[in-house]
Every structure is written in C-alpha cells, then in structure tokens.
C-alpha cells in the first residue's frame, strides 16, 4: 500500500483481488463481440452489420434526429432519472398505472437493478440453459442461485421453467427472442404462464 498526494491510499494489483466479493471472483468475464472496425480489418470487408448487440445498422430516423437537435441546448443538464415523461407515455399507450413501469439505460442496467432489488442470498432465479449471460452473472453477484432449465429444440422450455418454481423462486427470466438462439415464444404462450 502506497500513500499518494491526495491523502488516500493506492493498493497494488496484488491486493485488489482481496477487495472483490467472492461471488464476483468466481465469474468468467463477459466477452462481447468484436468491434465493427476490427471485423472489417480482419476480413477485408467494407460493410458489417452487428446483430449481437441489438445495434441498428440504419442509424437514427430523421424524426429522432430532429428531436435530438431540439434537445441540444439542454444537453448540459442531467436528464430526468425517473423517466417521468417516458413512463407517462407508456402508461397512456398500454392503459396501466405509471407506477407499474420501471425504466433503465438498457437491458444490462435493468437486469442488474432487478437482481439487486429482488434477490437475496440463496434465492432462486430461473432461466434457460442457453440464454443472455447477464441473467446468470447478476444472479450470482448477489449470492442467489441460478436455476438453468434445459432447452427444447433451442427454445426456452416454458412449461419446465414454470414447473421449476419453488418457494425460493424470486425471478424467472424470459428472453424473447432468446439470445443467442433467436427463438421466440408467442404472446399466447406468455399469457398462459402468467395465468399459472
């Protein structure tokens, strides 16, 4: 440990691991797909469409560009972290109470927030055996137990997921379309689960 000018302490790399939670030490790092420029250079191609990260290959619509240009003068201010306007629009569109809506900055953020808010140590979190890896990693970070259900023809086996519910189950993750298999389940199938 070395002190530095600001009055705090700098901990060398060999000590950093001692600060990390055991639940995080056991996780394999998430490795995202290669950046577009790297793929272009490696394979000597000009156009790459990256589907793995849900990126829009067409860019913003003109409507979005117009809205952004109108907001440029207030870009120095923090946005509404409670997403009041967005919640009001969603509530109006689906005729539900705005207090039932939870917004976040992308799925990674929402998954993490759900796990931190809902899961206690040793609670169970049900998911497909092959699905978005953030469900399992965030479940493990909070000390909960991922319950992985085998796939059925590369699809989430919804019936088996429902059968796996116990008194320790706090979260069931339905990825639709499922990442990485791309398979889907219908609205009718989902409603049948909710009604159980």
Question: Where is each model-derived feature located?
Answer:
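N-terminal amphipathic/basic-hydrophobic helices that include classical n-h-c signal peptides
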Residues: 1-15
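Glycine-centered small-residue hotspots that permit tight backbone geometry or close packing
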Residues: 1-5, 33, 106, 182
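N-terminal small-domain helix-loop-helix segment of the aminotransferase-like
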Residues: 12-106, 113
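Conserved core of the PLP fold type I
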Residues: 76-195
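Alpha-helical structural elements
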Residues: 4, 25, 38, 73, ...
């Amino acid at each position: 440990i070395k002190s530095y000018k600001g009055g705090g302490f700098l901990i060398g790399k060999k000590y950093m691991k001692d600060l990390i939670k055991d639940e995080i030490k056991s996780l394999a790092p998430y490795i995202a797909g290669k950046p577009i420029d790297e793929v272009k250079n490696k394979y000597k191609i000009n156009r790459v469409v990256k589907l793995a990260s849900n990126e829009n290959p067409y860019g913003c619509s003109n409507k979005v560009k117009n809205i952004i240009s109108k907001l440029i003068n207030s870009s120095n201010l923090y946005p509404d972290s409670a997403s009041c306007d967005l919640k009001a629009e969603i509530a109006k569109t689906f005729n539900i109470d705005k207090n039932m809506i939870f917004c976040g900055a992308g799925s990674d953020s929402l998954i993490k927030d759900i796990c931190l808010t809902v899961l206690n140590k040793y609670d169970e979190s049900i998911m497909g055996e092959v699905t978005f890896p953030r469900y399992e990693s965030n479940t493990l970070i909070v000390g909960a137990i991922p319950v992985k259900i085998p796939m059925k023809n590369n699809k989430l086996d919804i019936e088996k997921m429902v059968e796996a519910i116990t008194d320790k189950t706090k979260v069931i993750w339905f990825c639709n379309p499922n990442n990485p298999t791309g398979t889907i389940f219908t609205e009718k199938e989902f409603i049948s689960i909710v009604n159980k």
